[in-house]
Amino acid sequence: MPQPVFRSGHWVPPDLPFYKANFDGALFRDSSSAGIGVVVKDFEGNVIGALSEQIGLPASVVEVEALAYRRAFSFAIEIGLQEVVSEGDSKTIISSLNSDCSCLAHFVHLVEDCRVHAGNLRFSAFTHVRRIYNVVADKLAKKARYLLLPQFWLEDIPVDVSPFVTRQKFYVKPLIKFQLVSSKKIKIKKNKKKFVTYL
């Protein structure tokens, strides 16, 4: 398994050709349920897919985060992705994926399931982000409180969550493609396929 990366600061898009799956969980103790939120975005910050799903109430916050992490990878596979960086705001989960600490025994089976799901991808990695920058997944997880069935979006996002996606795209560095036209001129086009570089 790749080493976890701990990062603070704003949401950071993945490098080409990878996708980033942000995940989060929410507890609804009054209804004995919990919510899972996942949003998958590309290197430009565009939404590839998202989900909001209600589940039974786990024993702890850590367990719902582990379930959300596992769901992030399985959702990525369901929508046909194979190169995925998974990102959440639970340091416990990110650390446990690279640890055999016995103190995690009460949910070790979930950690192992996460590793199995990650192993089904051509490339998988995991990073930590501060909760404030995981807001899209958080909103989707909390949205599950009112759902009877899971909801999925492909290349779309709920209207009430969309402003948070737009705000995160502000930090995406533009990518451009340089194409040699002559020995003296260079034509610049907006990125479509290959030969990209960060400004």
PLM features: residue spans?
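Primary recognition of RNase H-like, Mg2+-dependent phosphodiesterase/nuclease domains
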Residues: M1-L199
